Design a protein with these regions (language model features):
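C-terminal and inter-domain tail/linker signature
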Residues: 1-128
Length: 128
């Protein structure tokens, strides 16, 4: 069981790094994407090709963007990643991405929630 969870965490982190940090979305899907991708982000249609195009556009608008992985949690076929995102020219972001993987460790489903890190907070805690 532990090997399965560690493999899934590794696959998701490598997928995310290729997609976001290295700007190699097509390679990320080739290595880690399943036969289908069910997308729950309302701004992005289902399927690898639409996500690849979405990330190509993001690369042009935010060159030098960077994702830092804060926490990674795996249970069953799900991996949850807490991410600190640097957006050049914009405020940083905090996000939670949830991935479902198939039995072969390939990514087949994705959810995310994102928010901007505010300049001031009502408490002394960080978002990370």
């Amino acid at each position: 069981m532990t090997e399965h969870l560690e493999r899934n965490k590794k696959n998701v982190l490598e997928f995310y790094d290729l997609m976001f940090n290295q700007c190699k979305a097509a390679e990320a899907f080739e290595k880690y994407g399943g036969a289908v991708l069910i997308q729950h982000n309302p701004s992005v249609p289902d399927g690898a090709e639409t996500v690849i195009e979405h990330f190509k556009g993001m690369e042009e608008v935010y060159p030098g963007k960077r994702a830092h992985f804060v926490r990674v949690i795996a249970e069953g076929n799900y991996v949850v990643v807490h991410v600190h995102t640097e957006w050049p020219g914009e405020r940083d972001g905090a996000s939670i991405d949830i991935f479902r993987l198939d039995d072969n460790g390939k990514i087949v489903e994705h959810w995310d929630v994102m928010q901007v890190v505010p300049e001031q907070s009502a408490n002394d805690n960080t978002m990370f």
